[in-house]
Amino acid sequence: TYDIGFQCLSSAAERNENILYICFDNEGYMNTGAQKSSSTPLYARTASTPAGKTTRKKDLTGIMAAHGVPYAATASAAHMNDMRRKIDKAKSMHGLRMLTLLIPCIPGWGLADDAGLVAARLAVESGAFPVYEIEDGERYTINVPKTRPVAEYLKIQRRYRSLDADEIEALQLEIDAGWARLERLER
């Protein structure tokens, strides 16, 4: 969705086709050995970026909002009630609706076998994957607050193990700036 096939999704959004599109965002091409995509976050190591990705993650939800679609939202299984509510809301609407669900990839992210839900929760609570919704491309609502430093999220993943303190701080500043932007848009 982020790269391959994006032009079709963008065209459907521009026409406001009656589609409920759900993107499972695992932040890379995980079916080909954990290669980078435009969904891969800044500094994350992948098979094709062993030194870490040097560009930020594409804001797909924001791009859909820029098309003026009736509904675009992010969600996480770590916040199941929020996810269910958004799915029900999207199903009740007409036009193109898009939900982006964060789906941690255990081997691709280098997580312990039992850490998928923990990673999803920390991604949301650190602001690395903000959970929010946008109606009609304009009305932003943040659904889960940012309550933790990103370092807590990074330390459980092998793809970030090579980061030094300066890179972690730079990533925190990037996340804080993105969060501040969302808060401005929510007003």
Residue ranges, per PLM feature:
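Short, solvent-exposed amphipathic alpha-helical segments in soluble enzyme
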Residues: L9-A13, S37-S39, D88-S92, D114-A119, ...
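Thiamine diphosphate
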Residues: T1-N31, Y71, A78-R85
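Short acidic, glycine/serine/threonine-rich loops at helix termini
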Residues: I4-C8, N31-K36, W109-D114
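Generic secondary-structure microfeatures
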Residues: S76, L102-C105
